[in-house]
Amino acid sequence: MKELIQSLLEQTLESLKAQGIVPADFEARIQVDRTKDKSHGDLATNLAMMLTKVAGKPPREMAQLIIDNLPASAQVAKVEIAGPGFINFFIDDNALANQLKAALGDAMLGVKAAAPQTVVVDYSSPNLAKEMHVGHLRSTIIGDSVVRALEFLGHKVIRQNHVGDWGTQFGMLLAYMEELRAQGDDKANLELSDLESFYRAAKLRFDESDEFATRARQLVVELQSGDAYCNKLWREFNDISLSHCHDVYARLGVSLTRKDVHGESAYNADLAQVVADLDAKGLLAISDGAKVVFQEEFRNKDGEPLPVIIQKADGGFLYATTDLAAMRYRSGVLNADRVLYFVDLRQALHFQQVFSLARTAGFVRDNMTLEHMGFGTMNGEDGRPFKTRSGGVVKLVDLLDEAVERAEQLVRSKNPDMDETEVKEIARVVGIASVKYADLSKNRSSDYIFSFEQMLSFEGNTAPYLLYAYTRVAGIFKKAENIDLTNAELVLDHDKEKELGNKLAQFGEILARMVDKGQPHILCGYLYELAGAFSSFYEACPVLSADSETARDSRLLLSRLTADTLKQGLSLLGIETLERM
């Protein structure tokens, strides 16, 4: 309905231009919003106030002119002027009911496909030298939910797992791997099964043994020069590390696969050319032996230009160089319209600098957007970054294990007679869903406090609450499996039916906002409100015991669309649903 009102207003604006009331060259971004108070209609616009100055008319007079020129639509029951010049639209109940009925027979649930774009999404991107930890959670699940929603809306999405698979630390790891292999493959494989311990042991050898450190540095040089033996060792290590990552992805229900891996090493051959091209454009300067770029718009607190370091004095390249090569690849080869980077907010300045430099250097097309979708920190209940009791980094797999264990205790306490297999399956779904939803339901730009107690609660905006809400709606159909709804009509007579219907009709708008802003909490908030609207409807409007078959069948249709929307919405967040809890 929002798109309909927008279209009617666009036609009206053209009519006002044709009549000379509004200048022909005037461009307006017409905004239509949902009203909070339904006594003021369903949708509202401030277009009259936008046109007041250019048309030279008072806002309310301008609003009346808009209404007088508005094309007639059977889907609009009435239009009113409110306050200083807002225009309120009341949607016809039958039109809304017909829209909802059509959504029931549609795989997209009535959501219109967007004008398709090619969207590259850079997310997760762990460092392969170490095991995935809680710091990787936000990028991985926020990026994945936005990817799912983009694909649902019809966009071509290219996932890019920009893993850290290159650098001097790999010399140390390969030297240790080589040392263990000399003692037998079994020992090497055993130690590699715990990457965190492997990394610590390698670092200890590097710090304590000059001979080992020399060998590690030698391996870095050989690896970078393309030595076949080193390359083989490096590939073996990365393969093992990626297996660890994909085990975690599988548990999280994340859609990344091996073919989405396009790590730092993929750009090695392009880095020298990036430097040469920046030099050819006169952008490079030398600072303390390093090749850097100074950009006037980026200065420190003393007003001095901040450099982007492109190549160190020893010839080594940096993240900025690799990111520039990646941007050029994503523009020229992948032909992206949008590139979204789900990376920690603390990297904001880095991305501002490299985005600006990529444009100045002509590495990306003018019509391609570069968007840093930064996120805050996941903190413990002490308000500090989440750590183990001893102050160490929490492995992501350990966090998931604890969530599932706690969920299992919860399920057992509520269902002491439940079958063991079912308990474990429900616990798995609830545990993983709770971790994901606790994160996704927060504004990604904010830090948040991680609390097992809060995330496993059945009250408030949590995964258990929504999963239970879905099972409650789906449960109605177990009792109504013999009722034929083929010819049922959907009618909205009760206020609570209309409220639920209006909420269901917003699904497409919500998804469009979510992918535009890269903010999954928008969808989470909507699903929570939808579950609340259904609860209010269910209390006020008996379904199976309705006064008539017509009312019963209509309410069953509303319930079916609610269940489908909850399930689809949770699926777009990467969350499985349950038929019973």
Swiss-Prot record:
Matching SMART domains: Arg_tRNA_synt_N, DALR_1
Motif 'HIGH' region mapped to chain: 126-136
Keyword Cytoplasm carried by entry: yes
Gene Ontology cellular-component terms listed: cytoplasm
Subcellular compartments: Cytoplasm
Gene Ontology biological process terms, A to Z: arginyl-tRNA aminoacylation
The enzyme's E.C. designation: 6.1.1.19
Reaction(s) catalysed by this chain's protein: tRNA(Arg) + L-arginine + ATP = L-arginyl-tRNA(Arg) + AMP + diphosphate
Keyword annotations from UniProtKB, A to Z: Aminoacyl-tRNA synthetase, ATP-binding, Cytoplasm, Ligase, Nucleotide-binding, Protein biosynthesis
Main location: cytoplasm
InterPro entries (alphabetical): aa-tRNA-synth_I_CS, Arg-tRNA-ligase, Arg-tRNA-synth_N, Arg-tRNA-synth_N_sf, ArgRS_core, DALR_anticod-bd, Rossmann-like_a/b/a_fold, tRNAsynth_Ia_anticodon-bd
HAMAP family, sorted: Arg_tRNA_synth
Quaternary structure and partners: Monomer.
Similarity comment: Belongs to the class-I aminoacyl-tRNA synthetase family.
Name used for this protein in its record: Arginine--tRNA ligase
